[in-house]
Structures are given as C-alpha cells and as structure tokens.
UniProtKB/Swiss-Prot annotation:
Mg(2+) 2 binds at D192, E228, E232. GO terms for cellular component: cytosol; plasma membrane. It holds the Pfam family KARI_N. This is Ketol-acid reductoisomerase (NADP(+)). PROSITE patterns: KARI_C (PS51851), KARI_N (PS51850). GO terms for biological process: isoleucine biosynthetic process; L-valine biosynthetic process. It comes from Mycobacterium tuberculosis (strain ATCC 25618 / H37Rv). It is an enzyme of class 1 (oxidoreductase). Mg(2+) 1 binds at D192, E196.
Amino acid sequence: MALEMFYDDDADLSIIQGRKVGVIGYGSQGHAHSLSLRDSGVQVRVGLKQGSRSRPKVEEQGLDVDTPAEVAKWADVVMVLAPDTAQAEIFAGDIEPNLKPGDALFFGHGLNVHFGLIKPPADVAVAMVAPKGPGHLVRRQFVDGKGVPCLVAVEQDPRGDGLALALSYAKAIGGTRAGVIKTTFKDETETDLFGEQTVLCGGTEELVKAGFEVMVEAGYPAELAYFEVLHELKLIVDLMYEGGLARMYYSVSDTAEFGGYLSGPRVIDAGTKERMRDILREIQDGSFVHKLVADVEGGNKQLEELRRQNAEHPIEVVGKKLRDLMSWVDRPITETA
C-alpha cells in the first residue's frame, strides 16, 4: 500500500507562524526544531527545568527559555522532545495542567501516546512530526536550504485541522522540502522499536560481538577481529545507506559478494526470523514497554547493569585502543546555530 506523501506545495507555513510553539527539551531534535522554527518566523520558546545544563546554550543561541510548565502555559502548540522515559512525568506535572481547549500536543515519537503512558485531554489535537534523521542533520539540511524526510501522524483531531498544522510544522523545520510521509502513531512506534531492537541496535551489536568472539576464540588477534567485524561495518552500512543492498554488493569484491550470498543465510536463518517475530509481538502487546517502565520506576537498575556488562566486553577494550590511533573518529558533532 502506497503511503501518502506531502511536499512544500501541500503545506501552509502561515498556519504554524500564527501559533506559539513550546519545545520541551533541547537535545538532538530539540535544538534543531527550535532553531529552524525560529528561522521560519515562528514564535518559539524552549522548556527546560531550572538548572538544566542546556539552558546557557539555548540563551547563547538567542532563544527564549523557561520552565516546561511556563512554556506550556504560554504556548498553544507544545512539542514534546524530552527523552521517552521522562515524558509521562513532564506531561503530568508540567504540561497537562496548562493545556487549554484548542491547543495542540506534538511528539517526535509515538511511544508514550500509543501505549497509553500519556493520555491527552479530548479537546486537544495530538500529532507527531518525526524527522528521519538526527537533529544535527535536520538542522544542517535546513540551513542549506534542503530538508530531511519526516513522518507525520494525527492521533486526535477535535477541530479537524491537525494534519494541516502538522504539515505546517514539518515545513517550518524543512521536512516538506524532502517529503513528508503520513503514518500512524501505532505504525511509527512499533516499527521504530522493532528496528532498534532486532537490527539497528540489539541485532547488530550481538552480531558484531559474536563475530569478534568467534575469531578471538579461534586464535586470531583481537585487533584484527575488531577491524573485520566492527570498524569496517561503517563502510558497508554507508554503501547500503547511499544505494541499497545492490549498491553495497556492486562496490565490494566478487569474493565478498559470493561469500555473503552463501554464508549470510546460515547466520540469519528461519529461526532468527521466528525470534524476531516473537520480539515484534512483545512490542505490539506492550510487554516491552511494561519492562521499560518497570525498570525506570525501579531506578534503571537493569539498564545500568546491562550498560556495565557491555562496557566490559573485550571488543570495547581493544576498540578504545585502536580508535586512539584514528585521528578522524571520536570528534564532536558540530551543531549549526
């Protein structure tokens, strides 16, 4: 089924220019949204807790900053870009008490709304504008007169203008220059979590560690194992990112291509796909989010223990040593003000 696409001519920038936008959070996406909204002629304020380390940066970049509660009280469009695990508390304590009929509540990711951790009042529009790229790229593309593709979704639309408002917001951050895809909170949330857990983060990490362990256990130097399964991964992913699987195989040697075709299905087989389906079901039925919330409420003990275990893996030890030799890595990303 083809998804509905929107571009510059489909969005009216004046809609969001006639609203007051409060951006809650100033991380990767928060800074990109706030600065680009401002540059598009939108009234914008940033909501951060007193004492937040990001406050001086916001002020240096010429934006107004106040507490989340005061920003929510001032705004009639509130974009929630705080971390997923902090959003429900911020909503309950700072945003919800200050929402007015006719306001709009926007999100950059649908998790909290889709799984019922945030339940907006019925007289407020609820929509999502989610750029498919990190904040520094969103901002850089905007400054260059281009844009990053976005997803938009409308979950609640009491006045019938939710989509037009979301598209206007997307235009203000450059999204309609590249293209905006209409989706749902359900589809965005579940596909995002599935991709992270089975491929992008969880699956890739475990594949890399397993390959490293097999080579080291077979007697090969850890340094060579690191180069072959982790360092060179970026080269392959960049090729896929630029032109798909065909571009990747076109660019590698015939030996690598032939070996990949033969051996890849032996590593990722029907059993792997079935376990991926199990993970998808756990996402869909809320089991994963239940575990996430329970860990947050328990002080993130499981997350901290898993982080500790990961940091102690031998691939991290040898990787640190090798990356110290590479002058082109581990440099901070430059933000475009």
